[in-house]
Amino acid sequence: MARERIPITREGLEALRQEYEYLVKHRRPEIARVIQEAREHGDIRENAAYDAAKHDQAFIEGRIREIEELLKRVELIEQPTDGDRSVVRVGSTVTIEIDGEIETYTIVGAIEAKPSAGRISNESPVGRALLGHRAGEIVPIETPNGTLMARIIEVQ
């Protein structure tokens, strides 16, 4: 069974690649050096520095493998070149009004989501509800606390 593709914006892909490069070129060799230094201090059975470095190494190697798997599955989301940016899709920045409050969100893939920075997942209740709609439409958003009605003010 083929694994599901993961939508990602150009900025998100670049950030993922930069993190991968940093971990492989800087953190991995740094941790290897720390482990070697800790080994040189004698008995590793009760060496806190060695234990901490091995823990860090496991975390870093796990993250490297995770990023490698993500990079195999990502699908770069490009903005349409035909000029039709009026439909909400992954990569769109959308301004909505809910109960008189105006919010602006960028719809991104789940791996890029950071709600505190206004980047919401296309899989979140708000993101999922907005996809495929246009400015001027009123869209129901199903949340754990009930249904909210959002008016789409602008799509960029």
Swiss-Prot record:
Swiss-Prot/TrEMBL GO biological process terms: DNA-templated transcription elongation; regulation of DNA-templated transcription elongation
InterPro entries listed in its UniProt record: GreA/GreB_C_sf, TF_GreA/GreB_CS, Tscrpt_elong_fac_GreA, Tscrpt_elong_fac_GreA/B, Tscrpt_elong_fac_GreA/B_C, Tscrpt_elong_fac_GreA/B_fam, Tscrpt_elong_fac_GreA/B_N, Tscrpt_elong_fac_GreA/B_N_sf
Gene3D superfamilies the UniProt entry points to: Transcription elongation factor, GreA/GreB, C-terminal domain, Transcription elongation factor, GreA/GreB, N-terminal domain
Example GO molecular function: DNA binding
Keywords: DNA-binding, Transcription, Transcription regulation
Top-rank taxon: Bacteria
Function: Necessary for efficient RNA polymerase transcription elongation past template-encoded arresting sites. The arresting sites in DNA have the property of trapping a certain fraction of elongating RNA polymerases that pass through, resulting in locked ternary complexes. Cleavage of the nascent transcript by cleavage factors such as GreA or GreB allows the resumption of elongation from the new 3'terminus. GreA releases sequences of 2 to 3 nucleotides.
Family affiliation: Belongs to the GreA/GreB family.
Full protein name: Transcription elongation factor GreA
Species the sequence originates in: Thermomicrobium roseum (strain ATCC 27502 / DSM 5159 / P-2)
